[in-house]
Amino acid sequence: KLHITANKLTANVNTFGTSEHKVQTEIQTLDLESAKNVYMNQKADLKVEKLKANETIDLQAKDTTIKEMSGKDIKLDVGNLSLGTIKATEKIELKVLGNVTGDEREGYHLETPVLDKAEITGGFGTLDQPIKTNIDVINSIVSRNSDICIFNNLDKTLTINTIEAANGWIQLVAGEIIINHLLSKNLSISTEGDLTLDDLNIYERVILNIGGNVQVIQSTHNSLTAQMLNGNIRGFFGTSEMPIRLKTDCISLVANNDIYTTSLKNTDDGQDYIVDQLVSNNGDVVFEHVDSSVNINNMKGTNVTLKNNDDIIAHMIEAKETLFIKTPQSFKSIDEDGSIKVEKLIINAGKKVKVVNGDVENAEIYVNDGTIDFINNLDKDITVNLEAKEDINVTLGNTVIEKIYTDGNIDLNAKDVAVQNDKLHIKANKLTAKVNTFGASE
């Protein structure tokens, strides 16, 4: 039955209700302190000026505005929830039929070691005004119809076991973040330190701004699924032992250190996988793809390894040392505005290799069942080791030939051509050459 009706209830008690028999109220404003517990069922909207208990707070109400609340374990079941600050020394549990919003403040809206369970019908914060938290662990937070936006204490590592906003954005800001399961329409993560992830499923776009490293909990399955991944990583992105396994359609990512990633195509639409950019400023790039052709706009690193089971089309690839490419199909760099700029180029292809604007010092190209077409910077001295089943057509500057072998024909345009030993250098059906010099007396 209804026990208390009033405009405002001010109380200082030892206990206020029990778990079996909650105090039934219909008041407008609450100012309550309890030495132990508070069990309360409010029949209408409620404004909490202060609610303090040393042990449990279990509150049911309609739309609720909280200025100040503190306890050991706090459980709220309300309509809309407007937050000032809630502090729990052990855990908080929320069930909200509307939205969770926070006021403008310097401090935190939620402070607790564990946000045990949060079921939100609407949104949890907004993109412009996230919920400010001081939390160690989120066991589960789910928004059914809107966004989840959290700004956690930047000095803490936030561990998230489950977070879902299938119809909205998830926006996370924290010191470091560990995520075991995530589901959302769009995702934005910013950290001061590392991001450790597993089982992230995003329908559309992911934006990462990571102050440390990105690593995975395990590499036996796809760690991140999305249509588009954008990233700015100040550390590394994956390792050789634990590469980041992606299922995406497009990637644009810059890291200061190494990048190790393997990928599948997310959408089975017959289109190329797009690498808008995959750049390591100070480390290596290792990119493996398995189930579609790949179109590369910009890829850069100290050493770059590129493997694919289908065709590779490249606009710009730059490696300070070695570029290694492997495909059972074809590799093409046919854009004259682009370039393959490397110290050493190694290509192992099945059907065809075509490079129209190379800037290469040493080229080793092997084509099992096709042709080689290679145009290098005429001002660049180059050493070549070329082998193909069919014709080889090259335009080069000063050239040292280790070998050029083919069952077809060779068309060689170069400046000075030299060799460094007495081994067999050229093998072909027909050699057509236009050069300044061809060998030397020595």
Please state what every model-predicted region is:
Residues 1-442:
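Extracellular lectin-like interaction modules
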